[in-house]
Amino acid sequence: MNAQDCLQILRQIKDVAFATVDENGLPQVRVIDVMLVEQGRLYFCTARGKDFFRQLEANGQAAVTGMNEKYQMVRLTGRAHRLSEQKQWIDRIFAENPSMNAVYPGDSRYILEPFCIDNGQIEFFDLGTEPICRAYFSLADEPVREKGFVITDACIGCGRCSRQCPQQCIAQGAPYCIRQANCLHCGLCAEVCPANAIQRRGE
């Protein structure tokens, strides 16, 4: 599994949730088709008259998520930018997504503007396995942001975190250690630790 594989999952799902922020700072979400995926880039389009277009132009920050039939979720957060050579990109999008011709027949397609996300963070989360599995990737060589929890050297070795963990992903040791690929990020371990030895990663 890598970043391109995750983007390909979003393409296979196709109808995914895109979230942006409006002019009042409020979150807005809608279902948008992933039109193309290649070389670490995700492509989509929207019409110039839509609020979605205005929000992308004003801010560019977007969050994308979808889940397939295997209960595998992919989440992408990054900045979307509008592409030049609009007609060329829209023609290619329509060629690879022919159902779009029924929605925007003829030259009406050119009310659409193509966008690309080629930067940001990707999270893969598989609920279809036991234990669950998660992984993190980034686009454009950005550093991967760590999430979840870590057990520090303040651990007293009582084992309470391991016994309470719903995925049993905490191994005994000095200190105890969380298997990050199987962690739910629920925070139960941090709440039950009597030594306050468990902290959020990256803090």
Regions found by a protein language model. Give the residues of each.
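A short, well-structured catalytic beta-strand-centered motif of the EAL phosphodiesterase domain
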Residues: 32-36
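Iron-sulfur cluster-binding cysteine motifs and their immediate structural context
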Residues: 160-177, 188-203
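A short, Trp-centered hydrophobic/proline-enriched beta-strand micro-motif
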Residues: 8-23, 62-66
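Short active-site oxyanion
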Residues: 39-43
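Short, structured beta-strand-loop surface elements
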Residues: 52-121, 127
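Ferredoxin-type iron-sulfur electron-transfer modules and their immediate structural context
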Residues: 112-114, 123-164, 168
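Solvent-exposed segments in extracellular or luminal domains encompassing
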Residues: 180-183
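Short His-Asn-centered micro-motif
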Residues: 45-47, 67
